[in-house]
């Protein structure tokens, strides 16, 4: 995305944003966003806005190599059933009508970009604290507004978002409540028991848990939201050598695993087991 395209998107969707430091609305001043409190954020020539310039990117584990591996996996179609499930939920509710979707923790932008293509009337915002992720997202053409942003204090105006999409990212329910419109919804994608079980088995000596359960995540979700719909994705697929390497490099399970182990492990297949959950947040946590 170039600067001209970014400016065009901002001219249309500027009312959806708010300054992350003071909460006031933005105006577009040249190639910068400026709020009434005089906080200023420059538009990057590569097609995004960094609204978390204070974040130390050098300590970010979600780096360019990880997002390159994720792109290999995602563009190979492994997560297409998840995208299809999210798309069907949005289609049932909005059809061809306009709506605002915020992809919280968008990474390299696979879901946000794909949904913007499927729903051209929608305003889609992709947010991630990793600049490398947003850089990877902004390299590809499209109509998504890409923002480097802290998800605990996102630069979104209160009550302006129809749907928050949260894919494999820790949820900040109080924040989601603030940015969602009345009646707005959260679509949350969480792992289930067999998710990437081949990687867990290969890395087992270096992991704290032998198995995974989403029980605590679901319990926490149920305290904050009414579950409206749930779809399960469960499939095991063969891998090429390149795809095996990409899966091993992209998962946070590998953060605690020695690089030598990650580089010498090869997987013949991978299991994807996820829950796609559409829900409406309670007015407050119970």
Residue map of PLM features:
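N-terminal auxiliary segments of SAM/dcSAM-dependent transferases
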Residues: 1-58
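Class I SAM-dependent methyltransferase Rossmann-like catalytic core
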Residues: 7, 58-82
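Conserved Class I S-adenosyl-L-methionine
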Residues: 13-15, 231-286
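Conserved class I S-adenosyl-L-methionine
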Residues: 97-107
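Conserved SAM-binding loop of SAM-dependent methyltransferases across substrates and taxa
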Residues: 108-120
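Conserved SAM/SAH-binding beta-strand->alpha-helix loop
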Residues: 128-131
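Conserved SAM-binding strand-loop segment of SAM-dependent methyltransferases
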Residues: 142-154
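Conserved beta-strand signature within the Rossmann-like core of class I S-adenosyl-L-methionine
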Residues: 183-194
């Amino acid at each position: 995305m170039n600067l001209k395209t970014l400016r065009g998107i901002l001219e249309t969707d500027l009312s959806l944003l708010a300054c992350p430091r003071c909460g006031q609305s933005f105006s577009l001043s040249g190639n910068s966003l400026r709020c009434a409190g005089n906080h200023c954020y420059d538009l990057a020539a590569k097609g995004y806005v960094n609204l978390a310039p204070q974040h130390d990117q050098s300590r970010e584990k979600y780096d360019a190599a990880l997002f390159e591996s994720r792109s290999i996996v995602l563009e190979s179609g492994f997560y297409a059933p998840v995208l299809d499930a999210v798309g069907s939920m949005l289609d049932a509710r909005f059809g061809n009508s306009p709506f605002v979707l915020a992809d919280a923790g968008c990474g390299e932008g696979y879901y946000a970009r794909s949904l913007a293509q499927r729903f051209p009337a929608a305003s889609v915002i992709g947010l991630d604290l990793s600049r490398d992720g947003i850089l990877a997202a902004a390299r590809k053409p499209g109509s998504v507004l890409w923002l480097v942003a802290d998800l605990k204090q996102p630069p979104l105006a209160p009550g302006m978002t129809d749907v928050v999409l949260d894919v494999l990212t820790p949820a900040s329910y109080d924040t989601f409540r603030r940015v969602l419109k009345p009646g707005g919804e959260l679509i949350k994608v969480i792992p289930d028991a067999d998710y990437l079980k081949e990687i867990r088995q290969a890395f087992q000596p270096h992991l704290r848990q032998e198995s995974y359960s989403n029980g605590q995540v679901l319990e926490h979700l149920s305290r904050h939201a009414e579950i409206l719909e749930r779809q399960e994705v469960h499939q095991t697929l063969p891998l090429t050598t390149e795809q095996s390497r990409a899966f091993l490099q992209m998962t946070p399970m590998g953060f605690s695993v020695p690089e030598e182990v990650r580089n010498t492990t090869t997987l013949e297949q991978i299991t994807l087991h996820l829950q796609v959950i559409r829900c409406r947040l309670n007015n407050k946590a119970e």
